[in-house]
């Protein structure tokens, strides 16, 4: 059976759940952003269309290429043999998603794609297929990402999340696929393995969670409820196979003894829920009735699962915030008093309501209901559940919000962030960089550095002068956190903080925390692991971006010695250009991190050398010669692992001489340090050809801090 590559899209946040769902269908897939990808047959793809509760679109991958202008786009689309995919008498429509650096108008992309397809058919058959935006035979999807265009052929014409049962809905509807996702995440599939599974939704609204739970309990394939479902009319479509699989799905439904109950205080939405339940054909397992959540009672003989998506106040309470918070406080009390042993999951974007429940969460997961970001809070009702606990993050948020009310001087900081971002945008678009310095103590009263790492912020507070009131300094720091959250639209949990001060000895290598959470970032053609929480620095020095490129270019297909290599980022860039690298550092932790960076970039770390050693001692005994050496020592170090204290101003002459002893006669030594008052030794200037390359190595985002480092290119005379 012919194999294809398929991408199955879903709402952001449920990718892993979708991957697990496909595993249960016997399909192995890879998790991607907003979906999963798998290699398989048309039959496999049909199974996803029929049985998936979580998928939005099942798409056959047609082609991917880099395009930089409209002619490129036209030629790329024309290079695809569309007659292999559908006949000229079949209609189609085009949908566009994502963003492209060079195409701001998606209508233009759609028109150019349509022209290329139609022209191809006309040139070969003297006929052209027609566009049908309402009821097409086929849907072609283009996903734009940076300068790449990915082309897909959709198997399902309309989104799979539509089940057709929801004829009547409230003001804040929950997508069917998201309802299914939170049920699965909350443990409903495990609950169904019990003799008598129990599910309660105490704020059921129009009944979406109840119905999705019943469909799973009765093993009803979601596609069977979608009366308007239409499979693609491609040359790859096998109608007989599709019909057979649908028949198998119909015969796989089962009787269940699950108890599924819904409650709501609003009779109007309960009436809608009842009609939706009948529409779905699951009235035999669901009961609904009017009840205030504050009066919720446990009338069941065994423990079960409570899953709910509260109305956030839009539907019932409007701006009556106090009333809404009282409801959640009462809900929390009822749970702790009468539902011992139960598991609870609450999906909401209103965090204050969760605080009012005064229950300890066991897990939190981010989901998206359309564009609305929500959190699924999970609880286990036991003797430890009733606990009013403020996490460090919650404390930081509380202090930040309060600090913002104490003065308005942080408005200048916010305006500077906006101005800097506007100034950097053209350069960021040109380079494609996602990690950069946005702010560096531009306003003296806000002595912080703001580094952007895609959706994360690394906020470094410069140690305040002894003459500055520490309380005022602390207040300004929290005001900075508040404005980064508000102005840059960064989630509080993605703002990571540090106080910059001189580190001594082993402090330079010790962990700050032990969260052990790594993130992947991109820098040009390389990827790196960064850690915002556990170490003093993140794992990459953004100000060394340009010198890393110089080193990599010079070391292309040559040998590189990287001294004080840290996490080996320069070595990775060089290795990607064919260099054979040797990285030397005192810290085994950072060398292991470096090896992981090599692996992340699909580079065989075994073909490169990683040496844990004091660089000075190692250089004294090294006999090998290298084409390029990158020497980037710390300003000061008195680590016990070193034979002596390192002071870069005092010791740079020794370091450079030792490094030059390991350099080939026609080689290049790149020397860098961050000591602001650094002066190059006259003896070194006399002995070697030394060129200061500070300006060359200064990136656009560090222009406001021109003394951030000293960079030299050194060669033999």
From Swiss-Prot:
Compartment(s) where it occurs, according to its Swiss-Prot or TrEMBL record: Cytoplasm
The enzyme's E.C. designation: 2.1.1.173, 2.1.1.264
Reactions listed under catalytic activity: guanosine(2445) in 23S rRNA + S-adenosyl-L-methionine = N(2)-methylguanosine(2445) in 23S rRNA + S-adenosyl-L-homocysteine + H(+); guanosine(2069) in 23S rRNA + S-adenosyl-L-methionine = N(2)-methylguanosine(2069) in 23S rRNA + S-adenosyl-L-homocysteine + H(+)
Enzyme class, first EC level, given as a word: transferase
GO CC terms: cytoplasm
InterPro entries reported in the protein's UniProt record: 23SrRNA_methyltr_KL, DNA_methylase_N6_adenine_CS, RlmKL-like_Mtase, RlmKL-like_Mtase_CS, RlmL_1st, SAM-dep_methyl-trfase, SAM-dependent_MTases_sf, THUMP_dom
Recorded GO MF terms: 23S rRNA (guanine(2445)-N(2))-methyltransferase activity; RNA binding; rRNA (guanine-N7-)-methyltransferase activity
Keyword Membrane applies: no
Function as written in the Swiss-Prot or TrEMBL entry: Specifically methylates the guanine in position 2445 (m2G2445) and the guanine in position 2069 (m7G2069) of 23S rRNA.
Entry protein name: Ribosomal RNA large subunit methyltransferase K/L
């Amino acid at each position: 059976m012919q194999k294809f590559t398929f991408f199955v899209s879903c709402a952001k946040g449920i990718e892993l759940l979708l991957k697990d769902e496909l595993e249960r269908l016997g399909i192995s897939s890879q998790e991607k952003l907003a979906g999963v990808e798998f290699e398989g047959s048309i039959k496999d793809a049909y199974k996803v269309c029929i049985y998936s509760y979580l998928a939005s679109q099942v798409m056959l991958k047609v082609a991917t290429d880099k395009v930089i202008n409209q002619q490129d786009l036209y030629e790329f689309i024309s290079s695809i043999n569309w007659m292999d995919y559908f006949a000229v008498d079949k209609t189609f429509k085009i949908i566009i998603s994502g963003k492209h650096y060079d195409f701001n108008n998606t209508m233009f992309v759609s028109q150019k794609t349509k022209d290329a397809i139609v022209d191809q058919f006309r040139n070969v058959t003297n006929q052209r297929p027609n566009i049908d935006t309402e009821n097409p035979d086929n849907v072609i999807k283009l996903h734009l990402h940076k300068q790449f265009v990915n082309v897909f052929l959709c198997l399902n014409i309309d989104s799979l999340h539509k089940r057709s049962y929801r004829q009547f809905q409230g003001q804040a509807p929950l997508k069917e696929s998201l309802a299914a996702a939170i049920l699965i995440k909350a443990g409903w599939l495990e609950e169904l393995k019990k003799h008598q599974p129990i599910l309660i939704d105490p704020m059921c609204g129009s009944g979406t969670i109840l119905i999705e739970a019943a469909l799973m309990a009765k093993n009803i394939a979601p596609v069977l409820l979608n009366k308007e479902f239409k499979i693609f009319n491609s040359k790859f479509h096998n109608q007989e196979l599709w019909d057979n699989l649908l028949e198998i799905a119909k015969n796989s439904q089962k009787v269940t003894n699950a108890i599924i109950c819904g409650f709501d205080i609003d009779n109007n939405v309960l009436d809608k829920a009842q009609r939706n339940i009948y529409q779905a054909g699951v009235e035999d397992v669901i009961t609904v009735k009017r009840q205030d959540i504050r009066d919720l009672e446990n009338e069941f003989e065994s423990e079960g699962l409570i899953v709910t998506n509260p109305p956030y106040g839009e539907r019932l309470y409007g701006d009556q915030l106090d009333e809404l918070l009282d409801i959640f406080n009462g809900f929390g009390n009822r749970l702790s008093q009468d539902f011992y042993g139960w598991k609870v999951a609450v999906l909401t974007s209103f965090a204050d309501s969760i605080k009012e429940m005064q229950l300890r969460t066991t897990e939190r997961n981010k989901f998206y209901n359309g564009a609305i970001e929500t959190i699924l809070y999970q609880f286990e009702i036991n003797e430890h559940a009733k606990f009013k606990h403020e996490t460090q993050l919650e404390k930081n948020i509380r202090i930040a919000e309060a600090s913002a009310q104490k003065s308005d001087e942080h408005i200048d900081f916010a305006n500077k962030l906006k101005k800097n971002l506007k100034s950097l945008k053209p350069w960021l678009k040109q380079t494609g960089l996602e990690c950069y310095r946005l702010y560096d103590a531009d306003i003296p009263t806000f002595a912080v550095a703001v580094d952007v790492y895609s959706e994360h912020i690394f906020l470094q507070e410069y140690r305040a002068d002894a003459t500055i009131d520490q309380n005022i300094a602390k207040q300004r720091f929290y005001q900075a956190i508040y404005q980064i959250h508000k102005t840059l639209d960064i989630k509080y949990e993605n703002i990571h903080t540090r106080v910059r001060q001189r580190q001594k000895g082993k402090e330079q290598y010790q962990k700050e925390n032990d969260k052990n959470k790594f993130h992947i970032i991109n820098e040009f053609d390389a990827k790196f692991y960064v850690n915002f929480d556990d170490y003093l620095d993140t794992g990459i020095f953004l100000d060394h971006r340009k010198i890393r490129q110089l080193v990599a270019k010079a070391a292309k297909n040559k040998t590189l010695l990287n001294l004080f290599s840290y996490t080996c980022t320069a070595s990775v860039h060089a290795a990607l250009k064919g260099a054979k690298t040797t990285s030397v550092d005192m810290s085994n932790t950072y060398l292991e991190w470096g090896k992981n960076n090599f692996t992340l970039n699909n580079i065989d770390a075994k073909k490169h050398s990683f040496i844990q050693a004091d660089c000075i001692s190692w250089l004294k005994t090294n006999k090998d010669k290298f084409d390029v050496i990158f020497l980037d020592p710390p300003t000061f170090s008195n680590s016990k692992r070193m034979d002596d204290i390192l002071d870069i101003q005092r010791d740079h002459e020794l370091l450079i001489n030792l490094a030059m002893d390991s350099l080939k006669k026609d080689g290049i030594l790149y020397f860098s340090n961050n000591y602001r008052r650094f002066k190059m030794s006259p003896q070194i200037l006399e002995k070697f050809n030394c060129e200061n390359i500070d300006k060359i190595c200064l990136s656009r985002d560090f222009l406001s801090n021109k003394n951030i480092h000293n960079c030299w290119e050194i060669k033999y005379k």
